[in-house]
């Protein structure tokens, strides 16, 4: 057994112990790709474009209430009348700008990716975190909203 498979199996065990379905599914997909000998064809594309695909799926999920009619112009205009909505808007902009800096950092120092991956795996598997950047903005906005409500 080679090192990548052993590493993935270790992470799978952590995912099972932590009962983290997303981590388990992700590792199962990667192990299946390796098992069927598709890694040379699929993994470079997943590595290069996977984050963008994930953000696209999350964006579709976030926009689904617009498509179903749950959120329309009336709700949008109404929401912008609250301080919470303005905080969320500002943090959406802030996180997008921070992500730009993160992309530049990873491009200039690819070795930092290993630490990033390890930190993400630890957060996802042990602390039930979510490996999704845009949700960080919502989390920060939530904290600030609670602080504004408190004071």
Curated annotation (Swiss-Prot):
Membrane-traversing stretches: 5-25, 53-73, 86-106, 116-136
Topological category with respect to the lipid bilayer: Multi-pass membrane protein
Disulfide bridge positions per record: none
Pfam families: DUF441
Cellular-component GO terms for this entry: plasma membrane
Subcellular location(s) of the protein: Cell membrane
The organism's place on the tree of life at top rank: Bacteria
Keywords (A to Z) from UniProt: Cell membrane, Membrane, Transmembrane, Transmembrane helix
Family the UniProt entry places it in: Belongs to the UPF0756 family.
This protein's name: UPF0756 membrane protein GTNG_2661
Upper classification of the organism: Bacteria, Bacillati, Bacillota, Bacilli, Bacillales
């Amino acid at each position: 057994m080679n090192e990548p498979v052993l590493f993935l199996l270790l992470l799978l065990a952590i995912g099972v112990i932590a009962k983290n379905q997303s981590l388990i599914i992700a590792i199962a997909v990667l192990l299946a790709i390796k098992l069927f000998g598709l890694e040379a064809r699929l993994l470079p594309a997943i590595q290069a474009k996977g984050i963008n695909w994930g953000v696209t799926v999350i964006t579709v999920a976030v926009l689904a209430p617009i498509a179903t009619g749950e959120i329309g112009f009336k709700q949008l205009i109404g929401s912008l009348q609250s301080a919470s909505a303005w905080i969320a808007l500002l943090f959406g902009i802030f996180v997008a700008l921070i992500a730009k800096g993160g992309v530049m950092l990873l491009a200039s120092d690819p070795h930092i990716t290993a630490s990033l991956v390890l930190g993400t795996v630890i957060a996802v598997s042990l602390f039930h975190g979510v490996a999704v950047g845009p949700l960080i903005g919502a989390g920060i906005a939530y904290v600030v909203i609670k602080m504004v409500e408190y004071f």
